[in-house]
Each structure stands twice: as structure tokens, then as C-alpha cells.
């Protein structure tokens, strides 16, 4: 393998999402990059970097990276090519400077997307009732089968992680319009203010990596002295209780000592660019 620079000029890039079937023109979007402090960039086929969206939330950390308080901001991005939606997740400061989670859906050109967002739809009401904390905030998102999965850290409150009436420490599933999915395991009605309507799986500490493969949901959950990789099954409690040992519960693989995974992807067996021994595998970024 060889590492090379594909595009540059980013400030604290935090997530990336590739257009599944990009256009052929030099100015057609190829992939999107989020910057931690609040800009969404789009890179075109000719490797020009454009600003797709900015100034859609307020955040002024007490200290900049590598300080703990500087870890907060724009965290995840996922694409819905059928509808031309670009979803981004982030933590922001409200009018009282309280840190909260949120998600915004940007409307773009279906299929190939566009260089600028046409409009924006915030999903604030789903998340606004519960404050969050630096680093244990909302995480990545993933579009699958006309639904959107999104992870949330426990906000440094392990008791809320295992409470299905809290959004913290969860994998959530919603429609592209931000509504609950009726087949979610704890769904009771369409009330967007009831966290249990959205819960797919629970009992996580800081699930900052997410990938859906053939309908199976995989998560890397950052722990105290160890991390875990697992399949997040529908309705299952992953038992984070504030202790080191609980991170190993229900894990498919334990990473010890902790490395703090921040991104994850899966390379399918059907793609032949990688050598055969590297296909059909997950890749975690630490």
C-alpha cells in the first residue's frame, strides 16, 4: 500500500463520505469532508475543494486541540444518493452555551449531489432535551435501506446509556425525514420526543465508529482502558455500566489497550482493487 495526498487545505477534517456513483464531469462531486469546527467541504473529480455548507451551528470550545474540550464539533456525515440528502452530525452550544447534540439534513441534487446545499432541515427536536459533553457526543451516521442510523456517546453518564428513555449511549434508527421507524425494537408511537421510539441498540459508552453491511450494524465502542468491536443487534443491551470489564461484554473483538477508534469502513469481497487477503474485512482508524 502507498499513502498519497488526494486533496488538501482542510482544517481538522473529521469525517469523509464518498458519492456512490459520481458524475463524469471534472466539477462533479466525488466525496465530502467535514471539518470539526463546522464546515462541510466537497471534493470534485478534478480534486478542487469547495465549501458545501458552513455557519449552521455555534461552537466556541474553551481550548483548541489537543485539549479535551477541543474534541467537540462536526462529527459525522452520510449520504442518501436517491434523495440527494447529505446528513451531518455535530455538537453545538445553545443560547446558554450548553453543549447539545444535533443533526442536519442538507438537500442536494439526487444521484450526483451538488457543490452547494440547496436547503437545510435540522433535526433539533429529537436531540435538544439532553445536554452532551466533549468527546462523548453524537457520532457517525449511515444511510441504509431508506433509514438513517446514528450513534450517540453516553455524555459521560453511564446510567443513561442503558436507559431506553434517553438518547445517550445508543445506536438510533430514523427515517430520512427524522421520524421514528415503526419496526424499531422499542417503538411505541410517532412522537419524536420519545427516545425509545428511535433506539436500535443501547448500553454503549462512546460508539464513535459505525458501518452497516448488508443490513447488519457494526460499531466500534471506545472504552476506558480497552475498546470493543461488535455487531449492534436489534434491541440488545451492550451493558456499559462504568466499569472496565463491561466494555468486553457482548464484544466480538476487544482492543486492549484502548486506542480510541474514530472511523471504520468495510472493504467488500467483490472489489478487486485490494489483494484478496484484504477483502471482506473491516478497517478501523485509530
Model-identified regions with their sequence ranges:
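Active-site rim elements
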Residues: 157-160, 194-201, 208, 247-255
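A structural motif
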Residues: 142-148, 174-182
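Beta-strand initiation motifs
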Residues: 1-2, 47-52, 106-124, 179-196, ...
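Beta-propeller blade signature
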Residues: 100-114, 164-177, 231-234
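Acidic/polar, solvent-exposed loop segments in beta-strand-rich repeat domains
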Residues: 157-166, 237
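Loop-centered beta-sheet repeat module
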Residues: 165-174, 183-214, 218
